Amino acid sequence: MTRKISVITGGHGGMGKAIALELGKKTSVLLADMNEDKLNDVKSNLESLGIETFVKACDVTDKEQVQELASYADSLGDVVNVIHTSGVSPTLCKAPQVIRVNALGTVNMTDAFASIIADGGVMVNFSSVAAYQLETQDEWIDIFEQYYDSDELYDRLYELVEPFADNDFNCAGMAYCIAKRFVIYYSQMNVDRFARRHARILSVSPGSHLTPMHQALIDLQPEIAEGQLDDIPVGRWGHPYEISSLIAYLVSEQAAFLNGIDILQDGGQTAKTFVTQIGD
């Protein structure tokens, strides 16, 4: 029987590890991230639980490295799931890196796996609740549609945030919102492409979950984190296992008619923020 492979980028991050634990119940997993030592630590943990695990260092902003990842995955077996969680936060990175990792990395991953994903396979790209924080502008859509396959994509996206360049935090935050909106739109642009291989593609937009990246925000800017928590109607942060459970459902046969959509899992934060609430 041919081995079934779930490829997970951000493989040593909080969400990546949780997803590997969940999908590893039914498939082998290939973890990708930039730090191979950390990947091997996760590999040891997963293998101790009986999950066949492979690792490969990969910078998702590098097309050649992503193509090598796809070729390696294809050599291992049928690539049934591609879960692209890799991303960087505007609290830790400046706007150029935010755009390269979150937007260009998504293009590289989607392009590389669109031609090898197995019949019935599913790709899930990770966006963010931040994609819903700003109203999508027609100018953004024009750029998304005209430059998605162009070397100019980075330049065009950076032009949108350049007016904020005198403030690194605001510039990075704007870049993050736009890049994550791009992830949703670009995933939807690929529905037909994946359907030709009888595969599906979706995106998910997590709100604030207790991952190492979010813990860094809590540690660096506790007042901002406290304000965010106040805006979440369920009254708590999300947990990585809640994302992994969602992913397990989305790649299952039970979700076979879900395609080309974004799933917002934010505890009600977006609704509370942008929709007038009864009783207010």
Where are these regions (language model features)?
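Short, small/polar-rich loop/turn modules that mediate ligand/substrate recognition or access, typified
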Residues: 200, 258-260
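A conserved structural motif in NAD(P)-dependent oxidoreductases
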Residues: 232-243
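Conserved glycine-rich Rossmann-like NAD(P)H-binding loop of the short-chain dehydrogenase/reductase
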Residues: 26-41
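Rossmann-fold cofactor-recognition segment
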Residues: 46-64
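Catalytic loop of short-chain dehydrogenase/reductase
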Residues: 90-92, 122-196, 206-210
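Conserved NAD(P)H cofactor-binding loop of Rossmann-fold oxidoreductase domains
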Residues: 83-90, 127, 268
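Conserved glycine-rich cofactor-binding loop
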Residues: 12-13
